[in-house]
């Protein structure tokens, strides 16, 4: 996958909307926890009653130590917080799989997720890997975003959920 990412384009975005994009580490967990909570409730969790802070902290800590996560951060009223994130959720021989892509609702449609993913794609390319991802069939905004980033649809997939009775 070709990626014509230029850091000057990202800096232009960062100057315009007062955010910066960074590669995250475990030290960033406290800044990311609320964004991870919103992501999991909107995109991942089937039964919201079963989700709790211990699970969110565990999943985020594991991702920050075993995967690659980039986020867009913003300072507002003297407080730093994450507005968007994108990361890998699987790393194979030839491909890194993107996952956990999420942007706070009030920051959507500003190309923030686009630039966060571009940072991630640049990192993936620097590792000599290609990128792949899955997207829900009805998630048209995400499909448009990924198409604008150069992704092409290669097939359909389904998720089966199992629950112990």
Q: What would you call each of these model-derived segments?
A:
Residues 1-17, 160:
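Acyl-donor-binding surface of acyltransferase catalytic domains
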Residues 10-49:
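Short amphipathic alpha-helix that is part of the acyltransferase structural core
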Residues 60-61, 66-86:
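Conserved beta-hairpin
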Residues 90-98, 108:
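A conserved beta-turn-beta hairpin within the catalytic core of GNAT-like acetyltransferases
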Residues 100-103, 109-126, 143-148:
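Conserved acetyl-CoA-binding loop-helix of GNAT-fold acetyltransferases
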Residues 124-135:
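Conserved GNAT acetyl-CoA-binding A-motif
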Residues 133-147, 159-165:
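Conserved beta-strand-loop-alpha-helix junction that forms the acyl-donor binding cleft
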Residues 153-156:
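A secondary-structure capping/hinge motif
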